[in-house]
Amino acid sequence: MKQPEITWSLMHPTPLDPDYVRKLVKKASEYRVDSFEICGQCHSPYGGLDGLIDYREYPDAFASWDKDKVAENQRRLNDILAISHAAGKAVYLWHREVMLPPGLLKDIPELLDSDGEFDLTGDAFASLIRYKLAKTFESVPDLDGIVLTLTEADYSAIHNSDTRKYPPEKVVSFIIGIFASELEKRGRRFIMRSFGSIAEDYECILAGAEALEGRHQFEIETKITPYDFDPFLSVNPFLRKSPGFTLSAECESVGEFMGQGNMPFEHVYKIVGYVREGQAAGVDRFVIRIDRRGNCIFDLYEINYYAYARALEDDKITAAGIRREWQEKHYPEQYRAGFIELDRLGWEMVCKTYFIDGQVLFHGNYCMKYLKAGFIFALFAAGKHTLANGRGIWSILTAKETPGRAAILKEKDRAVMLADQGLALLKKLDPPSDDHRWRLWRNAVVVTRAVRELVRCISAYFDDMDAGKADCPQLKAQVAASLAEFDRLAGHKVEIVKREFVNGMEHRMKELNRSIEELVLEPLAAICGELEAEFAAESAARRKFLPGCRDGIIIGGLSDDWRIVRFMHASHALLYNGLPSRWAGNRVFPNGFIEMELVRGNKLVIHGVTDETRKFTLVCNGKRIPAEFDEKGKFSLILPSGPEKVTVRLEKNGKVYPQFYAALTRNE
């Protein structure tokens, strides 16, 4: 079997660090490694190409830009290139589009169209891409290539609301074509990541790339699991060879959704399966992430990376064989049986901590915004409901039903028990104090308890709401108890930091090696505290909007979360004027929508916010209707007789994203 290229993917997502690369170059001598990809601070304004350019040709952007930060990035990347090249490793830098420094829209207003959306096929954007590439190679001339991503950026490249004006596949071809041609001129490698948060992302990106067959040669890099590194997801159906292009598979070893290197997470069995899937797809290059937020696999459970290396080297070796090899080499005989048991316990414990019945609990930052975005509150709904309405959320297993609050609490109790069991076993074994397991299992005892407190508070919210207790006595008591537990776990009073809400992608600047208190306790304590305000707001909205209705939904409320169809990052919910609300769209997902099914009445009523716009688009049973709130934020539509259920979809109409409170039907 032909051996694929092996790339280590580094610094996810942390500042450029030459000393770290020096360390990895030494480690690479123990394995076959051909090249490096560098993520860097990709979720910040200073990631990718933008962090290497001072924009001095554009006065407003130049004035807003941190020139010292840019100079430091240039110096660090040039050092990294020198270190890597001396070891014979090529370096490919991650970049996202569309990213803009503050002020650049004043310098180049032509970047936006008449609808206030990004002009994705205009000359101004094409010139800007060429400018970014030219300036990058002026400052880092030895860079070997670029890895481009078209999602999770300041502006959407594939989700604009007018697909006739900006057909996604043509937009992708337009952008890729510029990158490919400019890099070909310079003799550099171009790699296109097909990563997306919904199936439509993959379809559009792959179609746009494949349309360039015969005109350009580049590589398509696709994740080994669809969307993100979730062990409960199936094989990625988009991991396929496109005619005329090479294929790379992006893999992961630390556990982005499994503790990010802060929890024990041996998963050799899964890794061997991923390698075999990639080999079956004809992958030319395996890209393996070896760190997360400053936690490197070689300081942790290196067995995971060893599993990739051995599975790629030997197509007959099994997970059991790899484990046996590693254990015999690296687990001292007096600890071996115990370490093997800890590996087994860690897998189950982590899965029961960071997932609810197989659904990802935390996306991005641990905050209320992403719990609402990720369909998490839908899992706590009373009774048995299908999760089919979570079809726009990549991490939801839509064939399942809501597990029930009792089952969720039981799952978290078991996670705590497993963490306690693991730490007790480690204490009994008593390996040297510098063994990495000490930190991971001590973390596990804290994290499992913190997550359990969050789940207890959410469950109390739903219990009180279901019982109609407006003063939420169970929730208040549980929040008080949970905050006390957070303080106990921290050893002092936990600081609760309020996060600024962004309707779109926030720039994450501090991603490096945060403490468990900062990473877990502080944000989870904040969420628990916010639940009381959420309860009061939802109760107020129900009293204000729903009396006398035939059927009604509080669009941004937690209790009705399971009834709202939306894309993961497209229609964020927040409290506004003391009421739960939800936007339809943002500049990352201008085509964002809110879709619901209501029992039919003879009138449909929509309530919303009029501060920024009264206009929106209503799609009622497939019929598009330009709609507008009255001065009180109310819109009504007479419904004809028809099927028992009416489907309602809300979208933007114009430049401004509309914000909604409630949708209901009445018989009048």
Regions found by a protein language model. Give the residues of each.
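N-terminal carbohydrate-binding accessory modules
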Residues: 1-3
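Catalytic-core regions of glycoside hydrolase
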Residues: 6-14, 19-25, 29, 34, ...
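A structural motif corresponding to the C-terminal lobe/cap of the Radical SAM core domain
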Residues: 62-63
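Substrate-binding cleft and catalytic face of glycoside hydrolase catalytic domains
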Residues: 79-116
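Catalytic domains of carbohydrate-active enzymes that cleave complex glycans
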Residues: 303, 310-587
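Extracytoplasmic
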Residues: 537-668
